[in-house]
């Protein structure tokens, strides 16, 4: 598939912790109880330096801090890791995705000094945002974003669209421009399984219901079809971008989609992966070089032309849901 010297991009999950309770996030069951397979963990600066030496950092063109389960602003050493990367690779493109509802004003100003592009998940205005981004504070997010932007930070506004907030798209776009965001994006989520999504509390009581936009609804059939396909050939996004994914527990995979350990036991993708690949390599047990030399990545690419992998077919097969979900608008400010 690729060698360690080929890697130019890293998608990095610094923590699996988060203060929010977004209903469609896999951390929780419909926003209620924690996922029983979730391991709460985070990667410190010390551990990061042990796993990724300076020579490896220097070969990277880009570094994206996000992940499947946590939010970077909850981790202790997020800023320090960005400082480490900027110090040893002045030209690296640094990005982070966050709900933006934590950390102090000085912290955000310091982050801006590291030339990190920050994508804020802001799903509407003050009256609609927290319907999905439960346990986040819209006013605090805007305050943090303004502090970041005022110190020269490159901020982007990402808005997930539902029935309850689609009437605010234009207002959010205009506000994002007024506040100094460089880009405004809308995302029609593909996480609906049918025409509604029930939000649960910690006792499995339904406390709210989310409804899809017509665009999200139109993707339900496409996603179901993609989940059933096992294609002999795919166009691997991770390979095409020379990317590596690292989870907060230290597990390594080509992309965030193959980080399947936290998935429920009945997951078709997880069971298919375990049957065919049989391992989740981890930096707590082996060095990065040892994992690359183990043949793990070759196992994955060999599967594409033999048995196929369900998750690979789903994410990089005939239906490109990543591109279908997003519409991006660049501001000239």
List each language-model region with its residue ranges.
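Conserved SAM/AdoMet-binding glycine-rich loop
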Residues: 17-20, 27-31, 45-124
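Recognition helices and adjacent regulatory flanks at domain boundaries
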Residues: 1-7, 20
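Terminal, non-catalytic domain-edge segments
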Residues: 322-333
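N-terminal juxtadomain amphipathic helix
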Residues: 68, 302-307
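Residues at or immediately flanking beta-strands
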Residues: 9-11, 62, 93-95, 154-156
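Radical SAM enzyme [4Fe-4S]-AdoMet core and its adjacent flexible, acidic
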Residues: 5, 13, 28-49, 58, ...
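Flanking scaffold residues of small Cys/His-coordinated metal-binding clusters
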Residues: 9, 13, 17, 307-311
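Local cysteine-cluster metal-coordination motifs and their immediate loop/turn environment
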Residues: 19-27, 310-321
């Amino acid at each position: 598939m690729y060698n360690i010297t080929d890697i130019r991009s890293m998608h990095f999950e610094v923590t699996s912790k988060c203060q929010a309770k977004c209903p469609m996030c896999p951390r929780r069951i419909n926003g209620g109880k924690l996922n029983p397979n979730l391991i709460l963990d985070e990667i410190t600066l010390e551990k990061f330096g042990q796993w990724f030496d300076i020579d490896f950092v220097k070969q990277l063109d880009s570094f994206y801090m996000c992940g499947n389960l946590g939010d970077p602003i909850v981790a202790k050493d997020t800023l320090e890791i960005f400082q480490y990367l900027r110090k040893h690779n002045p030209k690296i493109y640094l990005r982070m995705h966050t709900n933006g509802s934590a950390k102090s004003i000085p912290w955000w100003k310091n982050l801006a000094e590291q030339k990190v592009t920050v994508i804020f998940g802001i799903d509407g205005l003050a009256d609609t945002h927290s319907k999905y981004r439960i346990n986040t504070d819209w006013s605090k997010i805007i305050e943090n974003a303004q502090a970041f932007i005022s110190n020269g930070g490159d901020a982007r506004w990402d808005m997930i669209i539902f029935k309850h907030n689609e009437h605010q798209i234009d207002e959010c776009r205009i506000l994002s421009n007024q506040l100094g965001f460089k880009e405004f994006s809308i995302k029609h989520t593909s996480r609906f399984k049918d025409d509604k999504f029930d939000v649960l509390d910690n006792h499995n009581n339904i406390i709210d219901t989310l409804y899809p936009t017509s665009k999200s609804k139109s993707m339900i059939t496409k996603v179901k079809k993609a989940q059933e396909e096992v294609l002999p050939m795919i166009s691997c996004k991770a390979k095409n971008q020379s990317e590596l994914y690292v989870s907060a527990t230290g597990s390594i995979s080509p992309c965030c989609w193959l980080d399947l350990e936290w998935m429920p036991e009945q997951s078709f993708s997880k069971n298919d992966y375990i049957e065919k690949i049989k391992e989740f390599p981890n930096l707590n047990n082996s060095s990065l070089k040892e994992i690359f030399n183990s043949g793990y990545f070759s196992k994955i690419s060999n599967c594409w032309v033999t048995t196929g992998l369900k998750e690979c077919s789903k994410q990089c097969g005939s239906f490109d849901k990543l591109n279908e979900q997003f519409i991006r608008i660049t501001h000239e400010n």
